[in-house]
Amino acid sequence: RLDSDWSDLPAGALKLMQNKKWFWNGMSALDKRIPGSYDDFVRAYAACCLFADAQVGRLLDALDHSPIAKNTIIVFWSDHGFHLGEKDHIEKFALWEKANHVPFIISAPGVGTPGSRCEIPVDLTVLYPTLLHLCGIKDQSYCDGNSALPLLKNPKAKWDHPAISTYGRNNHTLRTQRWRYIRYSDGTEELYDHQNDPDEWINLARRESEQTHLAKLRDRLKFSQDAEPVSDLRKPKARR
């Protein structure tokens, strides 16, 4: 049993996250002075999500009654997730699951089964190439991401492209269907088994029994970092 959810965090995590604990500490102190404050905060956040959902519903209702409904691709996503106290943290600015897990819904005429759900993690670099595919543009040689069209057609399709996120300089996380691997700029690491620990309570990075998994994920992240970018934005073409 751990004394706190930060007890098994490595030095890199503590350095990156320590100055972001003010929100959690402040909310904890407020809840002690005014019991129920934390519950009110969570309810307020849920209410904001509910309101946003209702407005999306209004847009979709309007689209359904328009002449372009059957020729429109709908994509719904968020730029980040949000902690509401998980890992003793509130807001985003982290490499853990809650900060990086976003809603991501794609609806395209004639593609996939309505209401189907895919459990395979992707990152948002799939968005552009997927839209190209859906629009009939097959040449994606200039895209850094991979089209998720195979997953739209079959949510259980083979997918060998782990989701990668970055926060701050040289702090990265890699997510597969089972594992979340985090590597900080100082080389320290976290490893979570989402099959048995979906809340990321226990950091397995220092356990001898998990070193094989850790090494594979470490190599996979390095492979992604070493890959040459498809488009060279450092050498823009002159405008004519």
PLM region descriptions:
Residues H80-E86, G112, D123-Y128, L132-H194, ...:
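C-terminal cap/loop subdomain of S1 sulfatases and analogous C-terminal strand-loop tails that border
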Residues L63, L151-L152, A205:
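Hydrophobic residues in alpha-helical segments
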Residues D61, D219-K222:
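Surface-exposed alpha-helical segments enriched in charged/polar residues
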Residues R1-P121, L134-Y142, R183, E200, ...:
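Active-site-proximal cap/lid insertion segments
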